[in-house]
Amino acid sequence: SPEFLEWLRKVCDVPHLLPDPYLVGAGYMKSYRGDSLKIHSDFNWNEECQTHRALSLILYFTPEWEEKWNGDLQFWDFDKQGKVVSYLPEMGNVVIWKYHKRGFHGHPNPIECPDDKFRVGFRLFYYIADSKHDWRDPPHKSLYWYDKDADQPYHLENEYGHGNLDANED
């Protein structure tokens, strides 16, 4: 709504903030036992709108969640020394963060919830209307840390457990 968008602009101090009418990469998300999301930096460019990412928002509506099940959204320092802060995917939790090329996050530990439980949320992305090209952070898709042990970029299994999504896909 216009009121929510204005609230986001004020709270996050991001003028000229726009929602994405195409919902690129946005929407419902559901994770099951064994799922994980490697630490990554989000895509920064919306080709449809020709705008740069400014904010990410996740609203969790997991009915019941225990910390021991993992699945917490973790924000890591750029040097991959460890997490700085994390948020449980509990009902009603909202996490909003400004896009930054070094804004690495994910839920890297496999979820260990009972088979009848799952982690659910809804994600939205917001963009800057007055985007200017930044040669230090050119448009890109999501970037995943390199896995030195496997000698390849980290891979993600898609939500149905088939195939891989690599660092060049989002």
Report the location of each language-model feature.
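A broad, low-specificity signal for short, low-complexity segments enriched in glycine/proline
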Residues: 14-23, 56-59, 81-88
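Catalytic core of Fe(II)/2-oxoglutarate
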Residues: 34-35, 42-53, 62-170
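Beta-rich nucleic-acid/ligand-interaction surfaces
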Residues: 24-38
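Amphipathic alpha-helical recognition patches that constitute DNA-binding helices
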Residues: 27, 56, 121
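Acidic carboxylate-rich catalytic motifs and surrounding loops in phosphoryl-/glycosyl-chemistry enzymes
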Residues: 21-27, 106-111
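Signature of the catalytic double-stranded beta-helix
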Residues: 1-25
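Short, conserved, surface-exposed binding loops centered on an aromatic residue
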Residues: 16-20, 29-30, 46-51
